[in-house]
């Protein structure tokens, strides 16, 4: 585990590390929770950052922008409205950024919520949570890769790699597991359970980002698991009306009582054992700005691993800010060509959804 003292020492040095350099970031799903905590840490550690924040309503987020601005008067904070579960909206937002910016140092994505066991679909036909946890993230990444690569090219060759542009997806990296899996399962109602959904979106993020890391070596790709954090995600899950949905009145009442008991018992315990939100923001900023190749080399010198060691360029990160080095679980998927298959599936979904929206056949 990377100590909090080391995290804070690194973050405190970001002002000097980025002196004379612009830092431009786009945050998706960061109007609260981990993403917002990371923004708060970033704007206090870098003098004049430019931060784009995607939100559902710029008017409703205006007060939060004002609060953030008070933390750093020199920060440029831009709220961008968008319904990110819709790929067409993702394209619109990306086009705004591409027109305004000549560089992008960090694409930070953390949208989503816990599955409630009942799929719901966007007007574009995608399962909503699958879109938030996977499809929209990959669409942002694909659209903004030219900007990320341009940033990499403008950096001087002798600059430290902690200034390499970075794609950062907060979900469940490092917790991939062996399971009967095909990419198409993401859209299957038959496989829509909480555990299956988490397992599938976790694996798809890892496979697709690893594929991109091989294709785009000038950009770092991170799939991170934040662990248990003191956000409202568990409370929202337990309080969701979907948790008590049933045709039978008695069963609906029993489920409602169970949720009340869980809220009374589980939530206090969760907040005791979970990581403070401020610390999570500190750790996520560290992971988004540290020299990951150097950390990879450092961890490689630690006691030997039993499995196959992951290669640098694509990093799965633990909530402790350590890189997941054991790559054994992914070997079977690679042998089956799953990274390429996941990528092909993703591109096919993009074409299908966006061609339908534009009226193409």
UniProtKB/Swiss-Prot annotation:
It is a single-pass membrane protein. SUPFAM superfamilies: NAD(P)-binding Rossmann-fold domains. It is an enzyme of class 1 (oxidoreductase). It is found in: Membrane. The chain crosses the membrane at residues 257-277. One of its GO terms (cellular component) is membrane. One of its GO terms (molecular function) is oxidoreductase activity. Its EC number is 1.-.-.-. Keywords: Membrane, Oxidoreductase, Transmembrane, Transmembrane helix. Disruption phenotype: Results in a significant reduction in leporin C and absence of detectable amounts of leporin B. PANTHER family: ALCOHOL DEHYDROGENASE-LIKE C-TERMINAL DOMAIN-CONTAINING PROTEIN, YALI0E05731P. Oxidoreductase; part of the gene cluster 23 that mediates the biosynthesis of a family of 2-pyridones known as leporins. The hybrid PKS-NRPS synthetase lepA and the enoyl reductase lepG are responsible for fusion of phenylalanine with a hexaketide and subsequent release of the stable tetramic acid precursor, pre-leporin C. Because lepA lacks a designated enoylreductase (ER) domain, the required activity is provided the enoyl reductase lepG. It is possible that the dehydrogenase lepF also participates in production of pre-leporin C. Belongs to the NmrA-type oxidoreductase family. This is Oxidoreductase lepF.
């Amino acid at each position: 585990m990377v100590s909090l003292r080391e995290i804070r020492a690194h973050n405190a040095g970001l002002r000097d590390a980025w002196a004379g350099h612009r830092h431009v970031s786009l945050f998706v799903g960061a109007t609260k929770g981990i993403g917002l905590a990371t923004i708060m840490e970033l704007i206090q550690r870098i003098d004049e950052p430019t931060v784009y924040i995607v939100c559902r309503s710029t008017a409703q987020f205006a007060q939060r922008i004002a609060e953030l601005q008070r933390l750093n008067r020199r920060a440029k904070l831009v709220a961008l409205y968008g319904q990110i579960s819709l790929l067409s909206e993702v394209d619109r937002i990306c086009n705004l950024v591409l027109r305004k910016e000549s560089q992008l140092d960090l694409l930070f994505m953390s949208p989503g919520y816990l599955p409630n066991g009942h799929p719901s679909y966007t007007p574009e036909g995608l399962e909503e949570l699958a879109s938030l946890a996977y499809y929209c993230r990959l669409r942002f990444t694909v659209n903004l890769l030219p900007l990320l690569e341009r940033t990499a090219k403008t950096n001087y060759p002798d600059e430290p790699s902690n200034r390499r542009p970075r794609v950062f997806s907060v979900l469940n990296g490092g917790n991939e597991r062996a399971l009967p899996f095909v990419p198409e399962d993401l859209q299957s109602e038959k496989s829509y359970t909480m555990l299956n959904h988490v397992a599938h979106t976790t694996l798809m993020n890892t496979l697709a980002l690893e594929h991109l890391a091989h294709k785009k070596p000038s950009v770092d790709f991170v799939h991170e698991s934040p662990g248990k954090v003191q956000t409202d995600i568990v409370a929202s899950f337990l309080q969701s009306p979907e948790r008590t949905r049933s045709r039978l009145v008695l069963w609906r009442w029993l489920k409602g009582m169970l949720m009340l008991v869980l809220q009374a018992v589980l939530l206090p315990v969760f907040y005791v054992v979970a990581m403070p939100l401020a610390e999570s923001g500190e750790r996520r900023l560290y992971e988004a700005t540290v020299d990951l190749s150097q950390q990879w080399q450092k961890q490689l010198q630690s006691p030997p691993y039993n499995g196959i060691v992951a290669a640098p360029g694509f990093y799965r990160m633990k909530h402790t800010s350590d890189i997941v080095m054991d790559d054994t679980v992914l070997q079977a998927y690679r042998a089956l060509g799953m990274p390429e298959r996941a990528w092909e599936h993703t591109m096919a979904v993009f074409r299908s959804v966006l061609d339908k929206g534009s009226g193409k056949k």
